[in-house]
From Swiss-Prot:
NCBIfam families: HscA, PRK05183.1. GO terms for molecular function: ATP binding; ATP hydrolysis activity; ATP-dependent protein folding chaperone; unfolded protein binding. PANTHER family: HEAT SHOCK PROTEIN 70KDA. InterPro entries: ATPase_NBD, Heat_shock_70_CS, HscA_NBD, HSP70_C_sf, HSP70_peptide-bd_sf, Hsp_70_fam, ISC_FeS_clus_asmbl_HscA. The lineage of its organism: Bacteria, Pseudomonadati, Pseudomonadota, Gammaproteobacteria, Pseudomonadales. This is Chaperone protein HscA homolog. Chaperone involved in the maturation of iron-sulfur cluster-containing proteins. Has a low intrinsic ATPase activity which is markedly stimulated by HscB. Keywords: ATP-binding, Chaperone, Nucleotide-binding. HAMAP family: HscA. It holds the Pfam family HSP70. CDD domains: ASKHA_NBD_HSP70_HscA. It comes from Pseudomonas syringae pv. tomato (strain ATCC BAA-871 / DC3000). Belongs to the heat shock protein 70 family.
Length: 620
């Protein structure tokens, strides 16, 4: 029978053919793509021969501009030009407000939701902006390699948390890229230098990019990396050097610190140019508007020394955490364009007592290492004749719970093969069957997800609500085929299904579902909370009504019954509305006014059970 292929759309079903895969360094300041060709990993250039793609996106009414042209227009069109979007990945609006003065954008969105940047094309999320950068890199790679890509290894800072990593994966999906793996930037750098081919040793990776700093201490044993310690700062990088120089210009020129976005962009560009010039020169003439001044390398060193000291402090802490001495570090790899600054290299050499490795362009080293890893994961390198392949689930898999809610069992981008189980229970007393509704999607409500299959588990022993334990297991095999089983743990009865709808998902459908999950995330969260409160209220109302029918006249006086009925009526009325908080509070009030009734029922049940029995019988 034809079974549903839960796999990335567009991939070849023939895994043993030569596959085109790339490594991508999605950086704060610059991005680039690399690939292994003729056995060598090298960055891929655009039509003009440029390898580096500035991580800048400018939105026009009818088109999107990415790269150098967008970066150059930043000061003239600051509201529609997005720089350093990596700093916003996976963060809420309240988080990015802490960077307020450094980000001359107009943000829209709720405090706890994804920040959207208001542009002439409408609101753009950081995921969408990053996707526009990745799309250009994908197109560049396909043009250079002469075919479609089967996947990419994308690097991220070791410090990125789960939400930032997920945002990176989502951006790749929107750009039409299959993510083979997210690789920590320090590990990619070590691979680029071939340090994974050494027999053993301790290696430090000092990664100072445009917006983040990472330090990783790795131990290599028998060609296998063991991460001994990591550290760093998600808000420390070359951008901060630029801001320090910009502050110096403002102070020296006697300018107002309250600059409009265009002037702020222009100031930062002047600061960045000065920093880059001082890599080779001892001094540089700086111009901003009508002001002109001279910045020396010594003055620059003084400005950035506090930031360098922060990075060295993190290095010492990371080494201390490993329990080894600084002298035991055998190699120090420099990563990130900001490590070109002479004082940075000097400080690192002084700390570790050895010259760092700088032979590979620090802007390219991460992408080069990622490309080597991508070539392996795509199956182009053989180890003992076996292909190393990796695939992931493109959209989350789950099932429907009470209230029409989607409960995710296997999150999207989980590597397959995989099996995950979760326990559920019955909703009503005496329930002997359970309907299992299998879903696919990222939204909170069943109505917004894709229905895959339905089946029933029958023969559940009748018992009070919540007593039965039903374990539902989702299993996706190496070919992406999904099977779902449900088992009542007490009796052992089981039912299962293999999902077999008549069609799969296209790329456009996956993209639409992902974009909808971003766009409606806030509304979905509110709707889910409301449904959860309504389900809790309904469960309590049914329990109280059942208790009243059974024991109300016997254990309650007329006034007590009246109070309980009034509270129940008020809760039923609130459940018709959309105020989740009010429903929650009224549910608590109803629970409180029925506490005494519940205690009396318990006492009555215990007395009835003990009636006519002596102590010896009870002890037996």
């Amino acid at each position: 029978m034809a079974l549903l292929q839960i796999a990335e759309p567009g991939l070849s079903p023939q895994p043993h053919q030569r596959r085109l895969a790339v490594g991508i360094d999605l950086g704060t300041t610059n991005s680039l793509v690399a690939a292994v060709r003729s056995g060598l990993s090298e960055p891929l250039a655009d039509a003009e021969g440029q390898v580096i793609l500035p991580s800048a996106v400018r939105y026009h009414a009818d088109r999107v501009e990415v790269g150098q042209a967008a970066k150059a227009a930043a000061s003239q069109d600051p509201f529609n030009t997005v720089l350093s979007v990596k700093r916003l990945m996976g963060r809420g609006l309240s988080d990015v407000k802490q960077l307020g003065e450094q980000l001359p954008y107009r943000f829209v969105g709720g405090e706890s939701h994804m920040p959207f940047i208001d542009t002439v094309q409408g609101a753009k999320s950081p995921v969408e902006v990053s996707a526009d950068i990745l799309k250009v890199l994908r197109q560049r790679a396909e043009a250079a390699l002469g075919g479609e890509l089967v996947g990419a290894v994308i690097t991220v800072p070791a410090y990125f948390d789960d939400s930032q990593r997920q945002a990176t994966k989502d951006a790749a999906k929107l750009a039409g890229l299959n993510v083979l793996r997210l690789l920590n930037e320090p590990t990619a750098a070590a691979v680029a230098y071939g340090l994974d081919q050494k027999a053993e040793g301790v290696i430090a990776i000092y990664d100072l990019g445009g917006g983040t700093f990472d330090i990783s201490i790795l131990r290599l044993t028998g060609g296998v990396f063991e991460v001994l310690a990591t550290g760093g700062d998600t808000a420390l990088g070359g951008d901060d050097f630029d801001h320090a120089i910009a502050s110096w210009i403002v102070a020296d020129a006697g300018l107002s610190a309250d600059l409009d976005p265009s002037a702020q962009r222009s100031l930062l560009q002047a600061a960045c140019s000065a920093k880059e010039a001082l890599t080779d020169a001892e001094f540089v003439e700086v111009t901003h508007g009508e002001w002109r001044g001279t910045l020396t390398r010594d003055a620059l060193n003084a400005l950035i020394e506090p930031m360098i000291a922060r990075s060295l402090k993190a290095c010492r802490r990371a080494v201390r955490d490993t329990g080894i001495e600084l002298e035991e570090v055998e190699a120090v790899v420099m990563v990130g364009g900001s490590t070109r600054v002479p004082r940075v290299r000097e400080a690192v050499a002084e700390l570790f007592g050895r010259q760092p490795l700088t032979q590979i362009d620090p802007d390219q080293v991460v992408a080069i290492g990622a490309a080597i890893q991508a070539d392996t994961l795509a199956g182009n390198k053989r180890d003992g004749g076996e292909l190393l392949l990796l695939d992931v689930i493109p959209l989350s898999l789950g099932l429907e719970t009470m209230g029409g809610l989607m409960e995710k069992v296997i999150p999207r981008n989980t590597t397959i093969p995989v099996a995950r189980g979760q326990e559920f229970t019955t909703y009503k007393d005496g329930q002997t069957a359970m309907k299992i509704h299998v879903l696919q999607g990222e939204r909170e409500l069943v109505s917004d997800c894709r229905s895959l299959a339905r089946f029933e588990l029958r023969g559940i022993p009748p018992m009070v609500a919540g007593a039965a334990k039903i374990r539902v297991t989702f299993q996706v095999d190496a070919d992406g085929l999904l099977s779902v089983s449900a088992r009542e743990m007490g009796s052992g009865i089981e039912s299962s299904i293999q999902v077999k709808p008549s069609y799969g998902l296209t790329d456009d459908e996956v993209t639409r579902m992902l974009k909808d999950s971003f766009e409606y995330a806030g509304d979905d969260k509110v709707a889910r909370v409301l449904r959860e409160h309504q389900v809790d209220a309904e469960r309590l109302l049914e329990a109280v009504q059942g208790a009243l029918d059974a024991d109300g006249e016997r254990l309650l006086d007329e006034e007590e019954r009246l109070v309980i009925n009034l509270q129940m009526d008020e809760l039923r009325e609130l459940m018709q509305g959309t105020d989740g908080y009010a429903i929650e509070q009224q549910t608590k009030r109803l629970s409180q006014v029925t506490d005494a009734f519940a205690a009396r029922r318990l006492d009555s049940t215990v007395k009835a059970a003990l009636a006519g029995r002596n102590l010896n019988e009870i002890e037996e």
